[in-house]
Amino acid sequence: MPSLAAVRRSISVLALAALAGTALGSPAQAQEEPLPVSVTGPDSVNLSLYQDPNGSTEPQIELGLRAPGEPVPDENGVTYPIHTGDYTVTVDASSLAGVAAVDFSALGGWRGCSVDGLVATCPGTEIYAGEDYNRLGGIRLDVTDESAAGDTGSIRVTAAGEGLAFTGHTVDVLVGGPELLNKQLAEPAGFRAGDTFPAPLGFRNVGGLGGDGVLLRVSGTRGLSFPATFGNCWYDPRDPEDLLGRSEALCVFDGEFAGDAAYGLSVPFPVQTAGFALYDAMSYSFTAVPAAQARELLAQGDHQPGTGPALELVRLPEADPAGYSRWAELDIPTKNTFDLDLTGERLRARQGDTVSVDIGFANHGPAWLALLRSGGEPISFAVDLPPGTTATTVPENCRPGWEGSEADYHCFVGTPVLEDDTRTFTFGLRVDEVIRNATGRAYFPYTMPNEGDPANDSGSIVLNPTRKG
């Protein structure tokens, strides 16, 4: 049984790897004999005792080789190996006997590997510069009935081949290390834009082991901000020019937390919503990281420290497991409206004339329209030309109506649409026939739930209007 100190060292390695996502890099070297090649892969894996029914079944460990340089195709687009010759990669997971089940089936690519118990041997013949073309495949680990919190082991990867100098790699495995699920949030009844959401943030450690130190990360899109300045939090407001960027707060908590236990904040975390906010995205997560090491990482960034009282973690006597998940997100507020407005023009023209017609698009607010959940895809409106006319020039973001469409053109408006946005779409129309009061229109062919004034969702385009037209 490993010592508590050894287990905590493993926990620290796992947590920092998950938080910082660091990767080792090697400078390019001139090829020489023997060719130096490194085995690549994660440094550690925290094997969960928590069986998520919706969890991934993909390998947690992806292995590869890294050789000097980068792959460069020739003039025909063909990339050639920098070494050709037999070599063997040996993956030894013997120390995981009784700790975890090991699946080598995704290892070795089309060649596959020969497996003897918990040892896999994989042959190869080519090595390319860099690592993109040197993937070895994946290893899947799963807990068994014998697995227990605190069990440790490792996977040792070595390789050998003539003319090659390999550097091996070791993946440390810890069973049941700290695994923090986040409390799900809900918008309060009657919540409106401009209100402050007192977010009851918290986590549940479903790992069998406790830990020392927690990092809280909170982020929010343009309509959200964090008005408090807690003394153990660091803040990075959104760049005003980055409309789809996020504000972020990072909070560090000292002290130990237990396994199979839930914790909340000593006071709610306030999230201020702007008057234009609508379906803005808030997300947060707790990560097990030693406080001193978290502060070292923060010192390398641009976050500014808070100056108020410190937040604290409070152990909760009871917590419904169903109220916690790996991802915690909330869209707030859901109650607000925008006012999209389409306008046309009234013009006079003779037969054969070509006229410019401006279709105006505006948002009179109060809310912006961002469509954050759909990746900022554009919205569209339809255009029917006045009878007796032909479009000679069409705005860049407009397309002819497709088969089955009733509109002559569809125009696309990129999002986000700000709360005071205005845009103009100019068509060139040739008058083929003079028709009194020839009327077209620009309109939205669908209903928008948060539209505050549907009455101005269409605008008329009138050529040669009569006094009564």
Question: Where do the model's predicted regions map?
Answer:
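Acidic, serine/threonine- and glycine-rich low-complexity intrinsically disordered segments
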Residues: 202, 214-216, 236-243, 248-367
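Low-complexity, intrinsically disordered segments enriched in Ser/Thr together with acidic residues
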Residues: 124-150, 253-282, 290-294, 413-439
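A surface/secretory-pathway sequence property marking extracellular, secreted
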Residues: 32-34, 82-126, 214-258, 333, ...
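Hydrophobic beta-strand positions in extracellular immunoglobulin-like domains
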Residues: 63-69, 141-143, 159, 202-205, ...
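Low-complexity, acidic Ser/Thr/Pro-rich repeat tracts that form intrinsically disordered stalk/linker regions
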Residues: 28-58, 65, 101-116
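Secretory targeting and sorting signals
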Residues: 1-32
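Extracellular/luminal low-complexity Ser/Thr/Pro-rich, glycosylation-prone repeat/linker regions
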Residues: 31-37, 145, 155-181, 285-342, ...
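Short beta-strand elements of extracellular/lumenal beta-sandwich folds
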Residues: 41-85, 187-210, 343-375
